């Protein structure tokens, strides 16, 4: 019998990104009564196989451990293109492959795999310091930047999520240190320090936390000095 061939597909992209891959299925040629006869891949026969081997259009995607659900796979039955959509955007690394199947015009089903890989991205943060005279209110803003990695020669960035307000490292937005002063952090990460009138010297640092659009956090300190 003429058996079609199947070659797996892989893809790699940054944390949080939707990925696609299209395994290659090819028909075969068989001789019938001295004549070459083409065996083709049947139209709209592309399908996924779930964990139990059932033909499905969508199926959960699992982490490398094979049990933790981290996204979904779906397939275009006309083209065989598989889409991986992450739902747990904190996960990075290899994803358990999904089985992809097609059927030949002579009714033979063959399958192969599609395997996405997720490259981790971590935001960066730079501390801030300010100095002012006794009694003066000071403001400082640690700098947060989305992490950037290069995937297959292309630079990709996960931006800081401006919809999630900055906080201090304990989740609060206001801190008071007796005998020193009060710190408040704004949504954009700007810290306002209001010193006690009698305080001079270097005040304790406070840690500001922000996160990117995958929920990956970064932190940096702000340190005011009163002269």
Regions from the PLM with identified roles:
Residues 4-6, 44-48, 70-75, 123-125, ...:
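Generic structural motif
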Residues 15, 48-49, 81, 134:
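Generic detector of leucine side chains in alpha-helical contexts
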Residues 25-26, 46-48, 104, 144, ...:
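Aromatic-residue detector
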Residues 28, 51-52, 94, 121, ...:
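Low-complexity, intrinsically disordered/propeptide-like segments
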Residues 40-42, 76, 109, 119, ...:
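Residues marking helix boundaries in flexible regions
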Residues 58-59, 64-112, 173-220:
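Acidic, turn/loop-rich segments in luminal/extracellular domains of secretory-pathway
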């Amino acid at each position: 019998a003429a058996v079609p061939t199947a070659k797996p597909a892989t893809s790699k992209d940054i944390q949080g990104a939707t990925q696609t891959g299209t395994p290659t299925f090819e028909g075969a040629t068989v001789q019938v009564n001295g004549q070459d006869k083409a065996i083709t891949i049947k139209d709209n026969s592309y399908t996924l196989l779930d964990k139990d081997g059932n033909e499905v259009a969508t199926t959960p995607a699992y982490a490398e451990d094979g049990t933790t659900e981290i996204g979904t796979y779906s397939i275009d039955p006309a083209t065989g293109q598989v889409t991986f959509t992450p739902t747990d955007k904190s996960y990075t690394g290899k994803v358990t492959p999904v089985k992809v199947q097609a059927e030949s015009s002579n009714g033979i089903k063959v399958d192969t795999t599609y395997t996405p890989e997720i490259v981790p991205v971590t935001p960066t943060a730079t501390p801030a310091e300010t100095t002012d005279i006794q009694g003066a209110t000071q403001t400082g803003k640690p700098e947060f930047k989305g992490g950037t990695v290069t995937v297959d020669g292309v630079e990709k960035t996960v931006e800081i999520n401006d919809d999630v307000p900055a906080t201090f490292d304990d989740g609060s937005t206001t801190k008071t240190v007796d005998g020193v002063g009060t710190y408040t952090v704004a949504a954009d990460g700007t810290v306002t320090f209001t010193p006690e009138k009698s305080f001079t010297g270097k005040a304790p640092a406070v840690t500001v936390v922000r996160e990117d659009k995958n929920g990956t956090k970064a932190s940096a300190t702000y340190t005011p000095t009163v002269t």
